[in-house]
Amino acid sequence: SGRASGRFQEPFNEKIASVLCSRLLDENDYVSYELEDGGFMKWASRCKPMTDQATEFVPAYALLCSSKRPSDLGLYDFYVSACAAHGLNVREDVEKMLVVDYLMANFDRHWNNFGVLIDSESKEWLPAAPVFDTGEALWCDRELTQPFGGYTTPRAGMMRPFARRIDDQVERHCRDLSWLDPSKLKGFSEQACDILLGNPFIANEPGRIDKIKAAIHLRAMALTKHTREIRRGRSFTVPDTDAASSTASKRAERHL
């Protein structure tokens, strides 16, 4: 369920993230959430368990604590190499998570809400855990007077999960994206905001829906350009959406 400080938006965000994932990812790549309306201020998101008696979830934090990370090895490379040591290539899985987080402006991806699945009895490592827990997103913590851009964690000890400036992760670690079809983002900003209209704390705040729609659209355009530049073999920097949120969001609105 959502919190008053976040306009009770979190359950709606989980549903929106599921819609986004259904557009971009395979069915097994994400946990699908449904929005339940239990009455005013009693919204909740529900999903089927991603584990059962035969499987367990091991958070990335457990991997971080299980072995010493060399000082010259970044967090991303450490996680990828730790999984590779157990026969898992998780680069594409991480890309998918970071792309979803970027488009959702998720500011709460931490080392306890991504990881791998293992066999409960044999302890054999199974594929990476699906994307889940994307409720703290879409600027639910920001006032309308604030920019709807990226997030920076307050100190290095709170990397979310691989960089303090969260949007930097797309540029640094999403360098393949062969799985991504950006054309599937068409209409997503409208679909997301249609879901948010079910929340009166958002729908009744003048200008909030329009600002969210423009900000999502801006991110979709930036990711599409990033993907094209990668496929052309060029270097591209994902723009600073904080700096762009005033002028570029207005420009994006004209193209919605």
Positions of predicted regions on the chain:
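C-terminal catalytic region of ATP-dependent kinase domains
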Residues: D119-L256
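A broad, structural surface signal
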Residues: K15-R23, E92-V100, A214, M221
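Conserved ATP-binding subdomain of kinase catalytic cores across diverse folds
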Residues: S1-C65
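A generic structural signal for short, non-catalytic loop/turn and secondary-structure boundary residues
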Residues: L24-D26, G38-F40, R109, E124, ...
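Conserved kinase catalytic-core segment
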Residues: Q9, L75-E143
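ATP-dependent phospho-/nucleotidyl transfer catalytic cores
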Residues: R46-L98
